[in-house]
């Protein structure tokens, strides 16, 4: 099995976990292909070159599975690099809170053994696509978690005129608007009081950021809707953020957000559910009084 390993910079205390991961992959006789930037980091920072491994850069088409080693941010960057290649991704958590990277360091060995036995499931995660006649969004105009429209600085609010399937919804006067997928419902959207959706829900969430009116609340819409946004700003510009990748945009252009025509494939263990993740990561039901 050809396994790609993608990662990000980390502290030295994570090195034993990383070494254990590569040792297990070698014990399972996998063909290991390490993301070039991650390989360079391990070599330069820790003088560590994993045995029996090759380097992969832009061409990932020959990989069977990709391991994302880090946190949810690393997982999102990995999804960008996988693009439309339809390669399943397994998130291994060496960061902090991880909804996408939910395999803990103490679960790596047993999870990899399950992986090589084919004992796992794949969840198809919806992506958002943003388009504009005048902007290419860095060549990758998709987001797995959310697309956020935000004011550029600490100045006054922006106004976001919003249409659903060409029918006027409202004009948000706010610091911004977060359009989130079910996957992104536990990310930025949740921090601005958006609801949590199950990964299999076929919906998007529109959550205003610090709206001028307290009556303006998040709304859940079907994911086959096309969202059209037109922004007004006193600074004549605003920010568009795709999973944290931000770009300045001028006012006067029309943005369209819709469901992408492909999905990100996420590997999950059979014995672990989304409800367990919610309990563990959000500490639902925990009593800390003692």
In which residue ranges do the predicted regions lie?
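Short glycine/serine/threonine-rich phosphate/pyrophosphate-binding segments
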Residues: 14-15, 73-78, 186-191
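Glycine-rich phosphate-binding loop
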Residues: 66-73, 176-177, 181
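Catalytic core of DAGKc-family lipid kinases
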Residues: 96-175
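Short aromatic-centered micro-motifs
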Residues: 162, 184, 240
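Gly/Ser/Thr-rich active-site loops/lids in small-molecule metabolic enzymes
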Residues: 170-174, 179-215
